[in-house]
Amino acid sequence: MVSSDRPVSLEDEVSHSMKEMIGGCCVCSDERGWAENPLVYCDGHGCSVAVHQACYGIVQVPTGPWFCRKCESQERAARVRCELCPHKDGALKRTDNGGWAHVVCALYIPEVQFANVSTMEPIVLQSVPHDRYNKTCYICDEQGRESKAATGACMTCNKHGCRQAFHVTCAQFAGLLCEEEGNGADNVQYCGYCKYHFSKLKKSKRGSNRSYDQSLSDSSSHSQDKHHEKEKKKYKEKDKHKQKHKKQPEPSPALVPSLTVTTEKTYTSTSNNSISGSLKRLEDTTARFTNANFQEVSAHTSSGKDVSETRGSEGKGKKSSAHSSGQRGRKPGGGRNPGTTVSAASPFPQGSFSGTPGSVKSSSGSSVQSPQDFLSFTDSDLRNDSYSHSQQSSATKDVHKGESGSQEGGVNSFSTLIGLPSTSAVTSQPKSFENSPGDLGNSSLPTAGYKRAQTSGIEEETVKEKKRKGNKQSKHGPGRPKGNKNQENVSHLSVSSASPTSSVASAAGSITSSSLQKSPTLLRNGSLQSLSVGSSPVGSEISMQYRHDGACPTTTFSELLNAIHNGIYNSNDVAVSFPNVVSGSGSSTPVSSSHLPQQSSGHLQQVGALSPSAVSSAAPAVATTQANTLSGSSLSQAPSHMYGNRSNSSMAALIAQSENNQTDQDLGDNSRNLVGRGSSPRGSLSPRSPVSSLQIRYDQPGNSSLENLPPVAASIEQLLERQWSEGQQFLLEQGTPSDILGMLKSLHQLQVENRRLEEQIKNLTAKKERLQLLNAQLSVPFPTITANPSPSHQIHTFSAQTAPTTDSLNSSKSPHIGNSFLPDNSLPVLNQDLTSSGQSTSSSSALSTPPPAGQSPAQQGSGVSGVQQVNGVTVGALASGMQPVTSTIPAVSAVGGIIGALPGNQLAINGIVGALNGVMQTPVTMSQNPTPLTHTTVPPNATHPMPATLTNSASGLGLLSDQQRQILIHQQQFQQLLNSQQLTPEQHQAFLYQLMQHHHQQHHQPELQQLQIPGPTQIPINNLLAGTQAPPLHTATTNPFLTIHGDNASQKVARLSDKTGPVAQEKS
């Protein structure tokens, strides 16, 4: 039940390939916890339950105290007992019949089920056959607990034909439970064996690939146990061999296992299957790498004596990878590069890395590190290995021989793959043999542990190396590397990156891995320049120092180019692009990416990247990798937590957008980079060399600081995409098993899908919140004022039919809009809307007598300049005619009088007089004519559409109530009056006032009182007439009835909007 991320310690694996279920989690017995699957302890008094979140079905681990179900129930301990076994302690959960049962009992008895698989409760016992309850536990019998032997239900030995039965918890305490891989990839079979068959099975399992493991992830990684054991033996043998050649202390045994562990972890994170296969190959092909990897070299500055030792060891060690580690181990403190500092010997000797990439021991000093430390390989260590390796390779022609080839290429590539974040400065001066402080000091501290999946890549590389050995020898005659001897140009790489993560790690590693393999001659002209990447603790500064014994340090890129022409590959710029990382080794890629910058990824130096140069030894080759001086910032950095802290995450990061992008530069096109640099055709010589894939080109002098380096990728995603695509092609070229590619692809797809789902969840969550908010708003009841429910819908329909000049009645959705005169420009509303709003509105809402004008601040509506209510009659005047505005008076329950239409420009009725029952409004549309209201009076002969339509649709009148019919009749009379005689503005208003007052008194006095609206008589006629004396809004000749004094009108509008604002907001 433990998450598949679980790391497996080597010691555990070696001691027992099948995990016995003892100690730790009450369910799975594992004592470790992970961030994604923590081990949770019950805080109940006297309770010792400890369970993994996944093992106990804890949906979310609380931040405070956590209690198991038993403690949570507060039931007396005496009453809580498992129905499947005699034991009372442990992780219990409720059963469907109200009892209790252990989670582990439920897992191992096949017929028991969980009602809810995610919470793992309740435990369903109804399907358990009665026969299980009749069995007796042979373990209880053996231990003298005969009384309890028949208690509960027993499981049986998983061995076919064996009839032994025992309680699950008894078997757990005896260590007889295990998990086997089921038929499907994701299936786990929980089973147990009697002691006899378990011990027998255990012996057979040690030699077999099939792994019995506690967890799925472990099961896959366990398949490699036998390999690890063999490797361990090999390591020991090699270590002995090393001792002969070297005075270095033998690596402590603890170191070896921990290293191995690392490897395993890495594998598990990447792809267990492919890895195990590759491990086999590695063992077969390159046992030589292994001991070097494990050996810890104490870093003592080497005097000339050490150097000589180194040479001797190289000569002897050609055939055994061990020698490489020895070289690295000693850093010549003296010698020509006295300045170089060596911190610990790099754990990986050049070739050594291949055996177990994980095994890199980055610890500075000889101390053994815990598996976690190993997990975090320090990039510098790896890098160092690759460098020293390169030194050796150049120094010894023999290196090319099978071993050396594997060492050089494999080790370098691997070590580089691992790129270590090294905390301490690593100075690797692979001088040609002479001073070669071959040991790159991996002074790098163990640095944060990266769990990387690099191993598979390493294995692949070792295989590749074998393939290439022949090529290398032919291409780079073994003699060439020797040529380098003379020159001390050993590059002295001092990479001190204060931030472990930032240090150059993966880029160089991956690059070198492939490139080094190919070119033992990396140092070929001795030209390795010593890049000293001294990254200050900040890691921002990476200074490259080129030391060429023969050649003067080249500071300019042109010189580098020349050197390249001479045949030296500039391992260009791996650092940033890391495409090589991928290319270096398929699986290693993830690792390198994880290293990738975490804080100052800028440090990545592409040290190992020097690819074998095809150059003649004579040329003073400057071409060494230019340390990519990118500071963390220029290099697209991924926060450290993003990559590398978890094994899976490193893979994922690597994979990250891989698939879609075309590789900018195909690996296949190895020569591409080199050629671009003007390298001689020979430069492209190792077609596979990942160096070619390096994408970053530094046009600036290598020493230049970050600003000179062109940013390679705008974002880490682009960088990773490039890496991925190039690595993919590289793997294809190498004939790497497709399963690695397939797994990487599937991981990438899963990651993309996961991101998509996360986005979807975010969007849905936001949508849900919006809907909840809207629901809350809508749940507030609308205050409905229904004084005179009248068949308003009929009237609205009628009005819609009768207003020929209007498109449709616009009614605002709020039922109270009747109160407001505010224009609603946007919503043409269906008649149904009108009816519904009209019915729910009080017929008098629009007609209510307004409070005194002075009480509210002036406010002007956009479409209606002024609105004046006179004892419930609303008069609207259009203030501005700049653009056609449809101002709608919200539907009210009864049809009011409509005053006048201006004949000339088909203006819809400008003013609306609402009878007390309500206002039937027609939109007041302004023509484009800026002063549409300039017509002072309505000519007597003007035809008024409204009265005509009213008479034409007289059939509709029958449907109206008496009250409404009266209103319409008054309307017609009023229109006729206007037609027959010219009225002065005062007469108009007086007439209108009387009409309204009459209706108001007759019908709506009770209504108004109910609504607590001031009486109709509060507004004296003088106030009404005052508007005519004030200057009109438009022209002096404007009809005062149509244009009411601006102040009065705006104040009314303000009041109306104040009343209806909240309602409108609620509705919207």
Swiss-Prot record:
Sequence segments annotated as region (Interaction with FSTL3): 141-233
Stretches the record annotates as Transactivation domain: 703-784
Zn finger spans (PHD-type): 22-74, 135-198
Single GO MF annotation: histone binding
Bias type Low complexity, positions: 211-222, 352-372, 490-505, 583-594, 674-694, 834-848, 855-865
Chain residue ranges for the region called Self-association: 80-287
Substitution effect: V80A: Does not affect interaction with histone H3
Entry's localization field: Nucleus
InterPro entries: AF10-like_CC, AF10/AF17_PHD, AF10_ePHD, EPHD, Histone_Mod_Regulator, Zinc_finger_PHD-type_CS, Znf_FYVE_PHD, Znf_PHD
ZnF C2HC pre-PHD-type: positions: 79-112
Basic residues: bias regions: 465-483
A Gene Ontology BP annotation from the UniProt entry: positive regulation of transcription by RNA polymerase II
Annotated site, KMT2A/MLL1 fusion point (in acute myeloid leukemia patient A), chain positions: D664
Membrane spanning stretches: none
Region (Leucine-zipper): 750-778
Annotated site residues (KMT2A/MLL1 fusion point (in acute myeloid leukemia patient C)) in this chain: A627
Result after altering M120A: Impairs interaction with histone H3
Residues annotated as site: KMT2A/MLL1 fusion point (in acute myeloid leukemia patient B): T266
Biological role stated in the UniProt entry: Probably involved in transcriptional regulation. In vitro or as fusion protein with KMT2A/MLL1 has transactivation activity. Binds to cruciform DNA. In cells, binding to unmodified histone H3 regulates DOT1L functions including histone H3 'Lys-79' dimethylation (H3K79me2) and gene activation.
Disease connection: A chromosomal aberration involving MLLT10 is associated with acute leukemias. Translocation t(10;11)(p12;q23) with KMT2A/MLL1. The result is a rogue activator protein.
Listed name of the protein: Protein AF-10
Annotated source species: Homo sapiens (Human)
Gene: MLLT10
